[in-house]
């Protein structure tokens, strides 16, 4: 038997694998035979039923087989349950043998039980109870022993209160128990200590002598210290007397110091005077500082005003209406982009056209932030005085794309400029190959822009005339010194007019920007680029000789050394109005 068991562990893996294959083949053959037998039986039953009835009942046979033959899973479950029940019965029998108690049936978990019922049902073993009782008895015995020991000590102390036990008389066990809670090393030290005192016993007289000797030594030390302190004090007093003798003797006073009296009222007055003088000096310093700070502020304001006056005197008409450097940079960038657009149109490069158009729109959007800065320069009272005295009324700025649309509605008097302004837009439509929808949308946009532009133009002309009247009234009132209230009232009126003018200018500029951005939604990128190129070329060819002439007149007036009055300025600008009248008569 031993040899066979040892050989089982020495099989090769090939042998094990071959045995596994044989087992699988045997199982497969058995299953196959069982299936064939069941199929043959089913076929025989179906043939018999067909001979009797003439119909195959396949479904009924299958259902009967399913009802008769339990499945493999159900069989496994039943076997498992039976096995578990057997195990449970064996455990209960073992439990009954160990604890000699009656057999308990298994609990029905469907029923509900409280904790008390479970405790009553489940029995406790007798061995555990015995152990608990023994532990309790041991604890009680230990407590009783400790109490007895403590009582004995208390009784001994009460019996002998007067006797003082020396170290020799005290037993070592008592010392260990009361004073020391130490290991073996401490016990050795105590034993050595007791042996030493046994060999050299201490008499009670020695203790008294040692105490007396210690007391005498302490007294001697204290006396020595007191003597030293007295000697030091005597030496100090003697030194002080010598110093007093060495000092020069003072002259004897002719009057007694005790008879001198002081007036308290005079002392209080002096104190009040000193305090008042201090307060006055502090206030004076603060006042001087305030005046100095005010003087510095006034000097700074005067210097600033002088610089502004000098700069305004040297400013020409062109410098007055010159835009900000940021807006100039924006215009120059737009011109560069338009040149690049023209080149891209010639090369027929659509990708570069889209990129340049995006860059152009981003540059023109900066105009919104620069509008208020430019408008503040125009709506400034100083610049408005110069413009009104010069007789120049600023027209609202229009886009070059929509310029000429308003003359189309009016009767054309054969002007070449108006014909050019109308013809270039028609040429652009043909060149860009616009559809009918695109051309209609552009025409509607131009008409809307024209209507809003005309309303703004009328409102601004009215405001310019009203501002000019207010300036004339202020100038006339300034010659009469008595009309100070009228000047202040007109000043408030002028402020309100300038604010409204500022709002109108901002709205006109925003109108141009909004209409320009809406063009990109109507046209294609190539068409928009072509429109920008054509409109830019047309707008750059226009000139404004009136503004140039006005700038020249204004520079001549300011360059003269003598201070010019209002009437002299008006006389010098008479030529400008005469030339305008001549041009109007020619056109009519």
Curated annotation (Swiss-Prot):
One of its GO terms (molecular function) is DNA-binding transcription factor activity. GO terms for biological process: regulation of gene expression. Residues 221-250 are annotated as: Disordered. Keywords: Coiled coil, DNA-binding, Nucleus, Transcription, Transcription regulation. InterPro entries: bZIP (IPR004827), bZIP_sf (IPR046347). It is found in: Nucleus. Its main location: nucleus. The keyword DNA-binding applies. Residues 291-312 are annotated as: Leucine-zipper. It comes from the Eukaryota. Residues 127-157 form a coiled coil. Residues 221-240 have a biased composition (Low complexity). Residues 263-326 form the bZIP domain. Probable transcriptional regulator. Belongs to the bZIP family. This is Probable basic-leucine zipper transcription factor M. It comes from Dictyostelium discoideum. The gene is bzpM.
